[in-house]
């Protein structure tokens, strides 16, 4: 069986008792085993069908909220002779289609940044708004 070695020094890894003694000598606390157990328990729960259903429901709720935010902004786009439409959401990417005057506008990048900022502010996590190019 191959010895466990540190790639940098090529020396065997210290036994757990020696590692614990070195931590105590350096004034470091031992790792919190209960926190690790809790983390693994949460990871195990994430694999359940209920967790998958909850995650899908949360994603659907985010898409609904993003769609509502874009619908709130549409009158501004239409007033300027353009329009914005939600194409799809892929994780933290929001793909939108700009049409009319907005499609060829030199300020489209700034407009998309404004939409991105609004979505990020309201939903409380970062999103990236990307234009969908249709021909």
Swiss-Prot record:
UniProt entry tagged with the keyword Transmembrane: no
Looking at the keywords, is Repressor present? Answer: no
Q: Where is the composition biased (Low complexity)?
A: 18-29
Q: Where is the composition biased (Basic and acidic residues)?
A: 1-10
Which InterPro entries does the UniProt entry name for this protein? FSCA_dom_sf (IPR034904), NIF_FeS_clus_asmbl_NifU_C (IPR001075)
For this protein, what is any one GO molecular function term? iron ion binding
> One Pfam annotation, family name?
NifU
Its BP terms in the Gene Ontology are: iron-sulfur cluster assembly; nitrogen fixation
Q: Which domain of life does the protein's organism represent?
A: Bacteria
Q: Which UniProt keywords apply?
A: Nitrogen fixation
Q: Where is this region: Disordered?
A: 1-29
Q: What does this chain do? A: May be involved in the formation or repair of [Fe-S] clusters present in iron-sulfur proteins.
Family named by the database record: Belongs to the NifU family.
Q: What name appears for this protein in its UniProt entry?
A: Nitrogen fixation protein NifU 1
Q: Per the UniProt entry, what species is this protein from, by scientific name?
A: Rhodobacter capsulatus
| Biological classification of the source | Bacteria, Pseudomonadati, Pseudomonadota, Alphaproteobacteria, Rhodobacterales
Please state the gene responsible for encoding this protein.
nifU1
